[in-house]
């Protein structure tokens, strides 16, 4: 049996401002740091440490990953940064407050851009585009160590986590779109040798934003 833990980054400054943060490389807030350390402490209390850890290339996931690893592994492991895990490119929505975007383009239009599978915001990515880069990463980089019985940590973003869970849990598109990931809230999977899920546990730490 192996262990896979997937965590969204702690609260970022973009989250705190209510923005479509996307590919903007914003730091964690103090609350985000606290959430991340708390997530690591909860995982350590479950007896979990990691053999390999991945983050996106964006600072908010790198710092969240380091804060978690400091609790579970000390300073013995450094996250591997992968651009495949980067947050969705929101195109023209990037950096805009969500309420301002709804006023500018209309709530229904913005909701389609956010939650349809194949319609991207202007100049940005759809969730289908994200799955096209995340699922190959999952197969080539995450599944092999799990098959060797290793413990793997992945710290990513709300939209890339949708695609990760789509692949791990074999979800339908509808179920994939329904996923909401609170900040710094680990999902712990116990994985069998055939990559089926033995047990799944959600550990609530942060908030959905």
Swiss-Prot record:
Pfam families: His_Phos_1. The record marks 157 as: Transition state stabilizer. Belongs to the phosphoglycerate mutase family. BPG-dependent PGAM subfamily. It catalyses: (2R)-2-phosphoglycerate = (2R)-3-phosphoglycerate. Keywords: Gluconeogenesis, Glycolysis, Isomerase, Plasmid. The active site is at residues 9, 87. SUPFAM superfamilies: Phosphoglycerate mutase-like. NCBIfam families: pgm_1 (TIGR01258). InterPro entries: His_Pase_superF_clade-1, His_PPase_superfam, PG/BPGM_mutase_AS, Phosphogly_mut1. PANTHER family: PHOSPHOGLYCERATE MUTASE. Catalyzes the interconversion of 2-phosphoglycerate and 3-phosphoglycerate. This is 2,3-bisphosphoglycerate-dependent phosphoglycerate mutase. Homodimer. Its EC number is 5.4.2.11. Substrate binds at residues 8-15, 21-22, 60, 87-90, 98, 114-115, 158-159. It comes from the Bacteria. Pathway: Carbohydrate degradation; glycolysis; pyruvate from D-glyceraldehyde 3-phosphate: step 3/5. PROSITE patterns: PG_MUTASE (PS00175). GO terms for biological process: gluconeogenesis; glycolytic process. One of its GO terms (molecular function) is phosphoglycerate mutase activity. It comes from Rhizobium etli (strain ATCC 51251 / DSM 11541 / JCM 21823 / NBRC 15573 / CFN 42).
């Amino acid at each position: 049996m192996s262990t896979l833990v997937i965590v969204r980054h702690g609260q970022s400054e973009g989250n705190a401002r209510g923005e479509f943060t996307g590919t903007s490389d914003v730091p964690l807030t103090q609350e985000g740091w606290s959430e991340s350390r708390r997530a690591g402490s909860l995982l350590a209390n479950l007896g979990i440490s990691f053999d390999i850890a991945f983050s996106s290339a964006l600072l908010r996931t790198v710092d969240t990953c380091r804060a978690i690893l400091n609790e579970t592994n000390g300073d013995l492991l450094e996250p591997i940064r992968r651009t495949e895990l980067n947050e969705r490119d929101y195109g023209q929505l990037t950096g805009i407050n969500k309420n301002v975007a709804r006023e500018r383009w209309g709530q229904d239009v913005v909701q389609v851009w956010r939650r349809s599978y194949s319609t991207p915001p202007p100049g940005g990515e759809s969730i289908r585009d994200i799955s096209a880069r995340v699922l190959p990463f999952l197969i080539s980089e995450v599944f092999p160590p799990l098959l060797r019985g290793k413990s793997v940590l992945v710290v990513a973003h709300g939209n890339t986590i949708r695609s990760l869970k789509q692949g791990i849990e074999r979800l339908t598109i509808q179920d994939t779109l329904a996923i909401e990931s609170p900040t710094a809230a680990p999902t712990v999977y116990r994985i069998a040798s055939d990559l089926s899920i033995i047990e799944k546990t959600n550990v609530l730490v942060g908030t959905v934003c």
